[in-house]
Structures are given as structure tokens and as C-alpha cells.
Amino acid sequence: MNRPSFLDQALFDEVAGKAAASARGRQHHNFHQMDEPCHRMAVGLQPSTYIPPHRHLSADKAETLLVLKGRLGVLIFDEGGAVVDKRVLQAGGDCLGVDLPAGVYHGLVVLEADSLMFECKAGPYRPVGDGELAHWAPREGEAGVAEYQSWMRAQFD
């Protein structure tokens, strides 16, 4: 029998610590098995992490993000890369999450160290595919990431 998993401060501290130690500045803690139809995870995020603008094209790949600790900025883009909406997502704030339909370009900026979000989307896991990464933004590891990430963060100054 599977046991309940609690989203408590001990888990938050563990995931935040692993995110801080990660070269990518983020860490996933899965509550699901990879073959389950619903993927649920806590994601620890540090300001250094780069989550490039992307979308999920499969009709069943909508996702919901809820901030459990800290502050994130979410940017919604049109097909050409213009920001059409943005919002600060903050645990205990006016807006703590977003439900993103499939096909919507979005990117995240971590505005507070040791932030943690809960993410839910349909499984199974599938890497971002052709046409899902924004053609107008650098990919993780490419030249220009630092400048683009600074621009993304500046949208919340």
C-alpha cells in the first residue's frame, strides 16, 4: 500500500536545499510514479534557474502551478514573443498560482530564494518537443541566457 506524502516544512527545506546545490538551481520531488496518468510534484526553485519560454502542444498537457513558498513571476507570451500577460505568484499573496492550457507559451522567473511550487499535469513524462520551445528565446545552456533571464526578471521590477 502506498503511504500518504505530506507537504510540510521538512519537505520544503529538503527540496530547497537540493535546488540550491543543483547546478540548474531547481529540484523536483515526485509524488507520482512515472507511469501514472497524473503527475504531481513539488519543485524547489532558486533565482539562478532558467526556465525558458515554452508551451505544451499535446491537448492533454495543460498544467497547474501553485506557489507553496516564496515568489515567482509568470510571463505569458504570444507566438512572436511579446508579453501578453504577467503575474507575480506568491504563497499567501493575491495570486498564488496559474492554470495553463495546452499551447500557451509561458516562462517562469524565480523572485525569491528557496521558492517552492506544486505542479500538476498529465503523465507520462514527455520532454519538451519540436515546436514547444520558443524560437525567440535562448535555450538552456545557450549564449544569451543571462541577458534574456535578466530581461524576464526586469518585467517584475
Model-flagged regions — what are they?
Residues 53, 74-76, 98-100, 106-111, ...:
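Short beta-strand His + acidic residue motifs that chelate non-heme Fe in jelly-roll/DSBH
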Residues 25, 42-60:
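Conserved short histidine dyad/triad with adjacent acidic residue
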Residues 60-80:
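Glycine- and acidic-residue-biased ligand/ion/polar-headgroup-sensing regions
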Residues 82-83, 107-157:
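Double-stranded beta-helix
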Residues 78-106:
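Short acidic-glycine-tyrosine-enriched beta hairpin
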Residues 42-43, 62-67, 98, 108:
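His/acidic/aromatic-lined binding-pocket segments of jelly-roll/cupin-type domains
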Residues 1-39, 85-91, 145-157:
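A short, N-terminal "cap"/entry segment at the start of jelly-roll beta-barrel domains
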